[in-house]
Regions:
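NTP-dependent small-molecule kinase module
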Residues: 2-3, 7, 138, 145-146, ...
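Short hydrophobic/aromatic beta-strand immediately N-terminal to the Walker A/P-loop
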Residues: 13-15
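P-loop (Walker A) phosphate-binding loop of NTP-binding proteins
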Residues: 17-19
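Post-Walker A helix-loop "phosphate-sensing" segment adjacent to the P-loop in P-loop NTPases
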Residues: 32-41
Length: 180
């Protein structure tokens, strides 16, 4: 394991949450680049892989049947269906990091964060929010990964998630050009 700070003698589980398009991946990428001493979990999903994504780095991409088998094996800390696809946080890497005394950060939607809180009450839940809904709409539209109807659904979901996110431990606004 790594040297532990004597002030913090116990393992920490952090969950970074927020609506789709708020910048969770960008924040986690910056944290990695800055060498933060954390284990960054990789989420499993059944959704199609996007052009710029690497299997095992951005997500673990599985078929519906592979994912279902993993659920039967109780392989996920939490799992959910989001926008028609399955997502889950594999338990194995989280448990390995915990056993080595390495703090863990998980990316999850608001629903996932609530599920993780049930499984791990000690988890620190952080919600990342956009400065406002028009900005979130712009970010999602720029990704060009959704149809107009799908974009409307994501925005409506984001508005509900922001209300739920207010119940988490910490709120952080991801302003344009202020990622650092």
């Amino acid at each position: 394991g790594r040297d532990r700070d004597p002030i913090r003698d116990k393992w920490q589980l952090f969950v970074l949450s927020g609506p789709s398009g708020v910048g969770k991946d960008a924040v986690l990428s910056l944290m990695r680049e800055n060498g933060l001493p954390l284990h960054f979990t990789v989420t499993a999903t059944t959704r199609p892989q996007r052009l710029n994504e690497v299997d095992g780095v951005d997500y673990f991409f599985y078929s519906d049947s592979e994912f279902a088998a993993m659920m039967v094996d109780n392989a996920f800390l939490e799992s959910a269906i989001v926008y028609g696809y399955r997502y889950g946080v594999p338990k194995g890497p989280v448990n390995q990091a915990r056993d080595q005394g390495i703090d863990v950060i998980i990316k999850a939607d608001i629903q996932g964060a609530a599920s993780i809180r049930t499984e791990a009450p000690e988890a620190v839940l952080i919600v990342l929010e956009p400065p406002d809904i028009p900005e979130l709409t712009r970010r999602l539209a720029e990704r060009m990964t959704e149809t107009s109807d799908a974009l409307k659904i994501r925005i409506a979901t984001a508005q509900r998630e922001m209300v739920e996110g207010a119940k988490l431990d910490h709120r952080v606004v991801n302003r344009n050009g202020r990622l650092d």
